[in-house]
Each structure stands twice: as structure tokens, then as C-alpha cells.
From Swiss-Prot:
Family per record: Belongs to the cytochrome P450 family.
Source organism of this protein record: Cicer arietinum (Chickpea)
Major localisation: membrane
Residues bound to (E)-cinnamate: 212-217, 305
Protein name: Trans-cinnamate 4-monooxygenase
Annotated localization: Membrane
Listed transmembrane segments: 3-23
SUPFAM superfamilies: Cytochrome P450
A family per Pfam: p450
Job description of the protein: Catalyzes the first oxidative step of the phenylpropanoid pathway in higher plants by transforming trans-cinnamate into p-coumarate. The compounds formed by this pathway are essential components for lignification, pollination, and defense against ultraviolet light, predators and pathogens.
């Protein structure tokens, strides 16, 4: 950094401090703000709480300041709610008032300033959801593609059985499951699949998506997002984000979207039964409902929101079953008893397997893939729990704490699927109880629930019925340390799993 830039930065900090103090005094008189740590000029609470705003750190703050508290992160107001009642207020009762998405310097790059579905501005949300519902999020889609999901899950089983290391020293099962998830979603999107983990296009796609996730999920860029005058220090980071974004969108366009357009020009896709998701999306584009960029950013959403989050949940489910052998045995016994030994789990079978469903619910409770949901924002001044919420505040719902608060749940730290068959038998993943919101609820809920639950059931069901899933030799358990990100909760270390095939003779 040269001397001139340093002088300009220090001057800007002094001016910003003066303005911040003045605004703070004026606003303090006008607003009744939620409690929280005392902020300092310019930096707010950033120096006190740091960049790492993961679900556990925010839970610790909730224990100090209450179910609603305010953090001043530089020039941004960050309001965190941590009770079912307040979650209902934000997501349902005042769903319109708090229905917008906050801006973020990195996500502005990766979503084209909200040209996707997840971060689209509230006014266009309903139209974008309508366009995406038909090709992705209906029971018709489940029935159309469930045979493909079952095929991909069985391919994992077959490949693991062929690998001699799987039943001895063990394998990193996640790698093969990642290919499965790409194939499941690329079948729906493009009617395409990858033959192996070594497929050059899959390798390239996986690497770019992985780099995108690393850049977007990191807390490293928060300081430049919260304090705009520090943004020059992010120049290299944001340049890398833009390069990754451009390369990904070009790859989506060249290898998938344009290829499907060419196919459509030579082969009729008017038959609804032959259409894949991109055909429906391109139809909407031709009608002028969305533009070329929207098409690519929708594809970008599915590559991250659908593939990664479901993969994280599958990986967490396997880890918990490996570490809780009695629970794994109960799942296996239920499948054998209800379906018969060797009868492979299918999508229609899932309704007959309540204990397997309880395992999935418990995985999503204890290891919620999006523990803070996706942030909300109020465009205008609003009221919440008797407090004033200034316009354009970032609202976080700590959904992980809602589902892990001992005041709300019996021994929440335990992995105990039985709770969903006993005292919590009424609780579903669709948001019927505001203590349990793995997919959110309301206007901004995740529509992918209709795909994620059956994919989780088929995958975990087939793995458990075909293998004994064990820790590697010399270990009694596998490491389940967490890694939290801006919007994610995944396992820190991708563990080696021993998969001993079962005999059905």
C-alpha cells in the first residue's frame, strides 16, 4: 500500500468517524434499538465480535443479550433473532416487510446483483419462483426423475462394492457421493450426466464450483463489506471472485445452455415429458419473462444451493450413523423388516420407513446445512418485538439455535432420532413448527425441500441396507468437527468410511 493511499484511508476514517458519531447520536434519540454490545465509531462492533459470525458465536451473543440483539458492523446494522416467536414474525407475520435480501459485495458478483432466484429483489421474487417451480419443485418432477435418483444411488453402491479399499482401510465416500449429486441435478437441469469422477468436464466444473464456494462462504471479506472505506484492501479478493464468476458462467453457457439450445433447434422438445428444466427456463426467456443473464444465474444457483447443501446433509447423516452404530442398526432392521432383505429402497418406500425419516430429520436439526438461513432485509424502518429496526438492516434468523436450544428441546446435543417419533412426532421439515426450520418458511423458504428429502432418504437408505458403515481401523468414531461459513455448516474433515458389504443370501 503506498503512502498516498494510506493518507487517504486515514482521512476517510476520520471523516467517517465524525459522521458516524453524529448519526449515532441522532438515531439514538429517534430509535428504540435492540440491545447489543456498545459500538465504537466507524468499526461498530466489528473489533469486538470479529468477522466470524457463525451460528455458535451468534448463539453465545444471544445468551448475553437476548432473543433479539443488534450488532453494528461498520456501517451496517445486523439484527439477530433467536426465538421461535421472533422467527415467525420475521419469516411469516411480517414476511413482506422483512422479505428483501441484503446486499453483499461478493454475492453481488456471483449473482449479478440479484439476477438469480435466491438473491433476487423482493418485487420480482414471485415471478422468479413461478418460473423455477415447474421445472424443479413439483411432485411431477419427483415422479419424473425419481428413477434416475435411484439409479444414481445404486451406482454409488455398485462402485463402492467394486473398490477393494472400501471394506478394508476405507474410502472418502463423499467423493463418489459428490458425483452422484451432480448427476442427479444435471439430469434434471440438462438431461446430462458424468460417467466418472475423472470426466474432464466434471473435474473442471467441480473445481470452479468449489472455488466459488470457498470465496463466497469465507468470513475474510466481511471487513470490506461492513466498512466500505476499507474496500480498496479487497481489490485482489474481488478481482478473483469476478474471474471465477466469469469462468463459471462461460462454462455453463458453452457446455450446457448453448448445447441444449442446439439440441432444441434440431429436435422437438415440445413434449412436456421430454423437457428438462433448462427447456422450461429457456421458454421463459423466449417469452421475455427473464433475460440471458437470469438463465445463467439460475444455473449458478442450482450448482450451489441444490447440489452442495444436499451433499453436506448426506455427509452429516453418514457421519452420525457411523458414530451411532445402534441407530444405524435400527435403520437397517426397519428396512429389512418392512421391505424385505435385499429389496432396494425406492422413493415410494420412504413413507413406510418412519425411523429412516426420523434419522433425516434429526440430521437436519443437529447439523443444519444453512444454520442462519439466507439473510433477510427490511427496505423500510420496521418494528420487531417492540424495537425499532432501521431500514436496510440485515436480519439473521439463527435457525440452528432454534432447533438446539435446551429450553425448547429435550437434550438437544444428543443425536436421537426417536424424538421425532415420540415427543416431537408432530414436527415436520416444512416449517410447521418455528423451532425447526431447516428449509426456512414463508416467501423466502427453500423450495428444494421437495427434492432434498427424497434424495436424502434414497441415498442413506441404500447405503445402510447394503453396507455396514464403520470408522477406519483403529478409530472408534470419525471426526465431526464443524466448519461454519456465511450461509453454511459442513463437516470440517471429509472422513474415511469403511463400507462392509452385506449378504442377502
Amino acid at each position: 500500500m503506498d503512502l498516498l493511499l494510506l493518507e487517504k484511508t486515514l482521512l476517510a476514517l476520520f471523516i467517517a468517524a465524525t459522521i458516524a458519531i453524529t448519526i449515532s447520536k441522532l438515531r439514538g434519540k429517534r430509535f428504540k434499538l435492540p440491545p447489543g454490545p456498545i459500538p465504537v465509531p466507524v468499526f461498530g462492533n466489528w473489533l469486538q465480535v470479529g468477522d466470524d459470525l457463525n451460528h455458535r458465536n451468534l448463539t453465545d451473543l444471544a445468551k448475553r443479550f437476548g432473543d433479539i440483539f443488534l450488532l453494528r458492523m461498520g456501517q451496517r446494522n445486523l439484527v439477530v433473532v433467536s426465538s421461535p416467536e421472533l422467527a415467525k414474525e420475521v419469516l411469516h407475520t411480517q414476511g413482506v416487510e422483512f422479505g428483501s435480501r441484503t446486499r453483499n459485495v461478493v454475492f453481488d458478483i456471483f449473482t449479478g446483483k440479484g439476477q438469480d432466484m435466491v438473491f433476487t429483489v423482493y418485487g420480482t421474487l414471485a415471478e422468479m419462483r413461478r418460473i423455477m417451480t415447474v421445472p424443479f419443485f413439483t411432485n411431477k418432477v419427483v415422479q419424473q426423475y425419481r428413477f434416475g435418483w435411484e439409479f444414481e444411488a445404486q451406482s454409488v453402491v455398485d462402485d463402492v462394492k467394486k473398490n477393494p479399499e472400501a471394506c478394508s482401510s476405507g474410502i472418502v465416500l463423499r467423493r463418489r457421493l459428490q458425483l452422484m449429486m451432480y448427476n442427479i441435478m444435471y439430469r434434471i437441469m440438462f438431461d446430462r450426466r458424468f460417467e466418472s469422477e475423472e470426466d474432464p468436464l466434471f473435474v473442471k466444473l467441480k473445481a470452479l464450483n468449489g472455488e466459488r464456494s470457498r470465496l463466497a462462504q469465507s468470513f475474510e471479506y466481511n471487513y470490506g463489506d461492513f466498512i466500505p472505506i476499507l474496500r480498496p484492501f479487497l481489490k485482489g479478493y474481488l478481482k478473483l471472485c469476478k474471474e471465477v464468476k466469469d469462468r463459471r458462467l462461460q462454462l455453463f453457457k458453452d457446455y450446457f445452455v448453448d448445447e441444449r439450445k442446439k439440441l432444441g433447434s434440431t429436435k422437438s422438445t415440445t413434449n412436456e415429458g421430454l423437457k428438462c428444466a433448462i427447456d422450461h427456463i429457456l421458454d421463459a426467456q423466449q417469452k421475455g419473462e427473464i433475460n440471458d443473464d437470469n438463465v445463467l444465474y439460475i444455473v449458478e444457483n442450482i450448482n450451489v444451493a441444490a447440489i452442495e447443501t444436499t451433499l453436506w446433509s448426506i455427509e452429516w447423516g453418514i457421519a452420525e450413523l457411523v458414530n451411532h452404530q445402534k441407530i444405524q442398526n435400527k435403520v437397517r432392521e426397519e428396512i429389512d423388516r418392512v421391505l424385505g432383505p435385499g429389496h432396494q429402497v425406492t422413493e415410494p418406500d420412504l413413507q413406510k420407513l418412519p425411523y429412516l425419516q426420523a434419522v433425516i430429520k434429526e440430521t437436519l436439526r443437529l447439523r443444519m446445512a444453512i444454520p442462519l438461513l439466507v439473510p433477510h432485509m427490511n427496505l423500510h424502518d420496521a418494528k420487531l418485538s417492540g424495537f425499532d429496526i432501521p431500514a436496510e438492516s440485515k436480519i439473521l434468523v439463527n435457525a440452528w439455535w432454534l432447533a438446539n436450544n435446551p429450553a425448547q428441546w429435550k437434550k438437544p446435543e444428543e443425536f436421537r432420532p426417536e424424538r421425532f417419533l415420540e415427543e416431537e412426532s408432530h414436527v415436520e421439515a416444512n416449517g410447521n413448527d418455528f423451532r425447526y426450520l431447516p428449509f426456512g418458511v414463508g416467501r423466502r423458504s427453500c423450495p428444494g425441500i421437495i427434492l432434498a428429502l427424497p434424495i436424502l432418504g434414497i441415498t442413506l437408505g441404500r447405503l445402510v441396507q447394503n453396507f455396514e458403515l464403520l470408522p477406519p481401523p483403529g478409530q472408534s468414531k470419525i471426526d465431526t468437527a464443524e466448519k461454519g461459513g456465511q450461509f453454511s455448516l459442513h463437516i470440517l474433515k471429509h472422513s474415511t468410511i469403511v463400507c462392509k458389504p452385506r449378504s442377502f443370501n
